């Protein structure tokens, strides 16, 4: 049973980004008792625009998930985590950490940033084969951070994954937030 969902924003936004609000709203509209919390990274709370180093971001994910699970009186394996772009990537890295693996019920990656735009040689996927939680990837077919072919290839070693491709959408998924929220809510309820 899923007790809650913890959501993290992309690098250039915060927890009040419209996409995270749409996900929260869609989950609440399922009429389940699934809790949702949107979490800001520490650099945003401090008013900085440039992200902290990866280990700091991963630790923020881990601490937020542990805190949410404690407040909901459940184990972390009853919690789905994820986020948009960098937020989803940091969640995937927390799950894949071989020394402090975070056991969760599922992972949602909206606009997974497989590589920087126009730099396909700089893949951010080495850890993905270690992600064992059920994973939902939602990406646009025109996402400049990774093509359909690139992301499909990078995630091929993962056993329990699902891809949803939004035709014509770029990394911003412009005007698709409600659709994305509904897709995620449906997937979370199905776990």
Label each region the model flagged.
Residues 2-78, 89, 93:
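Serine-hydrolase catalytic machinery in alpha/beta-hydrolase-like enzymes
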Residues 13, 141-146, 171-172:
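Acidic catalytic loop of the alpha/beta-hydrolase fold
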Residues 20, 124, 133, 147-154:
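Short alpha-helix in the alpha/beta-hydrolase fold that links the catalytic acid
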Residues 34-37, 157-172:
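Catalytic histidine neighborhood in serine/cysteine hydrolases
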Residues 61-133:
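Primarily recognizes the serine-hydrolase "nucleophile elbow" in alpha/beta-hydrolase
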Residues 130-132, 137-139, 143:
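Short beta-strand/loop motif that positions the catalytic acidic residue
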Residues 141-161:
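Conserved loop-alpha-helix segment in the C-terminal half of the alpha/beta-hydrolase fold
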Residues 169-181:
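Catalytic histidine-centered segment of alpha/beta-hydrolase-like enzymes
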């Amino acid at each position: 049973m899923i007790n809650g969902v913890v959501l993290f924003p992309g690098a250039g936004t915060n927890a009040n980004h419209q996409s995270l609000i749409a996900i929260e709203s869609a989950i609440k509209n399922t009429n389940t008792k699934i809790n949702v919390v949107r979490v800001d990274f520490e650099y945003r709370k401090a008013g900085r625009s440039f992200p902290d180093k990866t280990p700091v971001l991963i630790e923020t994910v881990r601490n937020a998930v542990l805190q949410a699970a404690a407040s909901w009186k459940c184990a972390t394996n009853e919690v789905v985590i994820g986020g948009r772009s960098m937020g989803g990537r940091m969640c995937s890295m927390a799950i894949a950490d071989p020394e402090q693996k975070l056991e969760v019920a599922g992972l949602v990656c909206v606009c997974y940033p497989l590589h920087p735009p126009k730099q396909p040689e700089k893949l951010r996927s080495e850890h993905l084969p270690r992600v064992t939680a059920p994973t939902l990837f939602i990406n646009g077919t025109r996402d400049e951070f990774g093509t359909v072919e690139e992301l499909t290839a990078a995630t091929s070693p993962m056993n329990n994954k699902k891809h949803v491709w939004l035709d014509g959408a770029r990394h911003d998924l412009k005007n698709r937030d409600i659709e994305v929220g509904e897709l995620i809510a449906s997937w979370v309820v199905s776990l």
